[in-house]
Amino acid sequence: MSGDAHVRFRERLGVRFPRATRLVVGFEREDDARRFLDAMRARLEEFELTLHPAKTRLIEFGRHAAAQRKQRGLGKPETFAFMGFTFICGKSRQGRFQLQRKTRSDRMRTKLREIKEELRRRMHWPIPAQGRWLRQVVTGHFAYFAVPTNGRALNAFRFYLTDLWRRTLRRRSQRNCLTWDRITQITDDWLPKARILHPWPKLRFAVKHPR
């Protein structure tokens, strides 16, 4: 972005912005980013709105961030969280820059705690009933988080959920009857395998906006 920063709201249309509105904006030049941020703050103040001080920041991120920071004797580029993902400046297997996304660890922990509590309430349900419910949970999780570069987090989610299910079943029956081999067989019968479901962003963009 160059020139003056223009931050406009559609106030004439009566659009309301919730307090939790989130926005990520990318710039090639730091001075453009700072000018935009100042303009954004000023514009929001006109409507008695503010940016969250702990969640608003400028970071060096992108294709050249790692090399530029290395030249200055700094560490790896910072990451940022957005819409349930942590965004990372990574590298592909060919050593090229790759924007990577992985499930936020705190979001995964929260989700697993919720599943643990619900499994306790459903402890005495038949295994098929538990399996059908857990299949819906895993399918919904994968439908959102199964993006490229997030395969490891998907496998981790399925593994920890399997362990929670194993612990729940062991609490209601003889412990020695439910080995890892047995619970693995049960989960393979009921839970989908972790796999990437969404295309790379550039492929999705090409479909929506063909040249």
What is the meaning of each model-derived region?
Residues M1-R211:
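Non-catalytic terminal/accessory segments
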